[in-house]
A protein has these predicted regions:
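Non-heme Fe(II)/2-oxoglutarate
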Residues: 1-83
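Catalytic core of non-heme Fe(II) oxygenases with the double-stranded beta-helix
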Residues: 67, 71-184
């Protein structure tokens, strides 16, 4: 489905100190191999996705950050009916790691993922590669601002997007999904 606008973003809006705090906080937990699919159908597939993840369960200050940006973008752009928020995912991409084109939407009743929030936590001087790209119908679209630390993007969850392989260093991101009743 095409949306107008296809995404909403804030360039380097989250302070570096907050990004660094989230990175350090995330490092205090044990991450696991990322999977593709959802819930019970989740599986490891290194041809599609290779990274480590950890879910921040009930970390209110982190939930508040992603919630704020989702609400602002949704009110400004789409006005989707949102009824809940999943746990934010802290993602670590090391050299050779990536996530190929995919969408975040889920169609599991009674709610579905409607909006995705992605935040680049990393200083762009600490990694190479790891480009966030979207498929808006004309092939890969690169939003260069997503390379900057603290940049936030919100987009409809059925939008195809990917992170290209990191070639050097480590890229950290925070992703969150907001859900609601099925579209009518």
């Amino acid at each position: 489905m095409k949306y107008d606008p296809p995404y909403w973003f804030w360039d380097s809006n989250i302070p570096i100190s907050v990004c660094d705090s989230i990175i350090e906080y995330g490092k205090s937990f044990e991450s696991e191999q990322a999977t593709v699919g959802y819930g019970e159908q989740g599986r490891i597939d290194p041809n599609i996705r290779k990274s480590k993840v950890f879910f921040f369960e009930n970390i209110h200050w982190i939930n508040g950050i992603t919630n704020q940006y989702c609400a602002l973008a949704n009110t400004s752009a789409w006005n989707f009916e949102i009824s809940g928020q999943q746990s934010p995912q802290y993602t670590i991409y090391r050299p050779g790691e990536f996530y190929d084109f995919h969408s975040d939407d889920s169609t599991f009743a009674p709610v579905m993922r409607k909006l995705s929030v992605s935040i680049n936590l990393s200083d762009p001087n600490t990694y190479e590669g790891g480009q966030f790209e979207m498929n808006l119908g004309e092939g890969p679209f690169v939003l260069e601002e997503m390379n900057r630390q603290g940049t936030v993007i919100v987009f409809p969850s059925d939008t195809q997007h990917r992170v290209t392989p990191v070639t050097k260093g480590v890229r950290y991101s925070l992703v969150n999904w907001f859900e609601g009743p099925a579209f009518k």
